[in-house]
Structures are given as structure tokens and as C-alpha cells.
């Protein structure tokens, strides 16, 4: 068994959260299903991996995720209920127990989505993002893997934004401790690659890339080498979406993928309104 694979079944963390089972393991944390003994509600308990306990940047990202998300309350943002340190000095987060799939896993299975479904997912993500930005926070790592699709009573799943580990205050530094641009290059806005301070419109570019991918089956820019991908974000025009797709949706994608923030939507609410109007034309 590795140093990170400790059987924690039955452990009570923070005198309140009794671990039931290991349900996932990411690059930074182990995720457990746990029972909140105070409310009798199941939650997800994320504990930083022991192998990262001596990594300052990993601990900073993990703690930032908790601090940022704990302040945000919206149905399209995964809730963080509590943060703390175990008796063994391990940082942990208590978060909403999500039972759905990521948009990434759905796209792997289905390749592309219907215009109505893609528009709904993007609209919901923008609803959550508006609250994030109103709080003065930028997500900085929006991508299909960070959009959870949760079962809901209606025909379309609930979208929940997750993973705020790279989030920062608007106008704050744009680099990690190692001095490199953070986030996933496939979804990153050109101004961040130019070394400019991002704002909320940088996140809108990422939503534009995701919407393009949902409608076409692939992101607008792909390359085998990082420098080629960077140059494409900076200089290349995105390929045209299929002409059979609704014109209103194609226009929204083009607007969101503008190379300069001033040419995009003013904020998440404005882009959401455009999507809402476009949805009225969809069959």
C-alpha cells in the first residue's frame, strides 16, 4: 500500500465527519464519502495526499480551493461546507457530495451534444460564474473536467462548477509559485498568455472554448506541442462551426473567442442573456 492509501474507514474527522468509504482519488487529494454526524447528511471529504504535505504550492492550492468555495453559495457552484486540519496535520475540505459525471466524461462518451443541451450547460455554468465574479474571484481553470453534471428532476442535469484550486482575486497575480501560467492551455485566454492581468472576461473565453467543443466534438485549437497551441490562441482564427448549427449559437461562440477581452461579452450575465435568447430559437 502506498503512503497515500491509508484505510480510514470509520475514522471521525474534526469530531464530526465519520468516513464511510474511499470514493475517488485525484492528483492532490483522496476523496471519501463521510457522514456528517451533526446533520446525518452524507458529504464528500477531501484530504490532501500525504505525499504532498511538504509541497508548499500544493498546500496553497488546496487551501485556496476551500477558502474561495466556502464563500460562494449558488446551485451552479459545488458547495464547500467546512475546512480543517486532521489530528495528523492533514488539510481537509468538506464538500457537497456530487453523484453525477464531469462534462469531460460525457464528451468522451458522446463526442458532441445537441445545441439545446450545450446551450443549457453553458448557461448554467455562466450563472455560477456570475456569482464567482461578483465576489471578486476568477476561476482560471474552466474546462470540461471542472464542470459536474448532477442528476436533476428536469430533462437537463444541473451543472456545478468545481475545483477552485487555481482561483484568485481579480487583479491579483497571474502566475503560480513556479512562475508559469496556470490553467489548462486548451482553454486558456490569449491575454493570459500575453502576460496581462486577467479579468472575468478571461473565464468567458474558456466558456467559449467549452461551448465550441460541445457543439463540434473538439476544442477549436489543438496541437502536439505547447508552443504551437499558445500561438494558435494568440493569433489563429477558430475554425468555423458547422453551418447547420443555429446561427445565434455560432455568433455567441465567435464573440466569446475574441482575442481581446474588450471584444467579448462584458460579463458572465451578458453572455448568459445571449444564450437565453438563442435558446428560444432552438427546437
Task: Please identify what each model-predicted range represents.
Residues 20-26, 31:
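Protein kinase glycine-rich loop
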Residues 186-283:
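C-terminal lobe helix-coil module of Hanks-type protein kinase domains
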Residues 121-122:
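Activation segment signature within eukaryotic-like protein kinase domains
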Residues 82-84:
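A short, aromatic-enriched beta-strand patch in the conserved N-lobe beta-sheet
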Residues 126-137:
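Protein kinase catalytic-loop region centered on the HRD/HxD motif
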Residues 88-102, 106:
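Conserved short submotifs of the Hanks-type protein kinase catalytic core
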Residues 49-71:
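AlphaC helix of the eukaryotic protein kinase fold
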Amino acid at each position: 500500500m502506498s503512503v497515500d492509501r491509508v484505510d480510514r474507514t470509520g475514522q471521525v474527522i474534526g469530531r464530526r465527519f465519520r468516513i464511510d468509504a474511499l470514493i475517488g482519488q485525484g492528483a492532490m487529494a483522496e476523496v471519501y464519502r463521510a457522514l456528517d454526524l451533526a446533520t446525518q447528511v452524507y458529504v464528500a471529504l477531501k484530504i490532501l495526499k500525504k505525499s504532498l504535505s511538504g509541497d508548499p504550492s500544493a498546500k496553497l492550492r488546496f487551501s485556496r480551493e476551500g477558502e474561495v468555495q466556502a464563500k460562494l453559495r449558488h446551485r451552479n457552484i459545488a458547495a464547500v461546507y467546512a475546512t480543517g486540519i486532521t489530528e495528523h496535520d492533514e488539510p481537509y475540505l468538506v464538500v457537497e457530495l456530487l453523484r453525477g459525471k464531469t462534462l469531460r466524461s460525457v464528451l468522451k462518451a458522446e463526442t458532441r451534444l445537441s445545441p439545446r443541451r450545450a446551450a443549457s450547460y453553458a448557461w448554467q455554468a455562466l450563472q455560477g460564474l456570475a456569482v464567482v465574479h461578483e465576489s471578486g474571484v476568477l476561476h482560471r481553470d474552466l474546462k470540461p473536467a471542472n464542470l459536474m453534471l448532477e442528476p436533476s428532476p428536469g430533462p437537463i442535469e444541473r451543472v456545478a462548477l468545481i475545483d477552485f484550486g487555481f482561483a484568485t482575486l481579480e487583479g491579483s497575480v497571474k502566475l503560480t509559485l513556479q512562475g508559469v501560467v496556470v490553467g489548462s492551455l486548451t482553454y486558456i485566454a490569449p491575454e493570459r498568455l500575453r502576460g496581462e492581468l486577467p479579468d472575468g472576461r478571461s473565464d468567458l473565453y474558456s466558456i467559449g472554448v467549452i461551448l465550441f467543443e460541445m457543439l463540434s466534438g473538439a476544442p477549436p485549437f489543438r496541437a502536439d506541442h505547447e508552443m504551437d497551441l499558445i500561438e494558435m490562441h494568440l493569433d489563429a482564427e477558430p475554425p468555423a462551426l458547422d453551418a447547420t448549427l443555429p446561427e445565434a449559437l455560432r455568433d455567441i461562440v465567435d464573440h466569446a473567442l475574441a482575442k481581446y477581452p474588450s471584444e467579448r461579452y462584458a460579463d458572465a450575465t451578458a453572455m448568459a442573456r445571449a444564450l437565453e435568447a438563442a435558446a428560444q430559437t432552438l427546437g
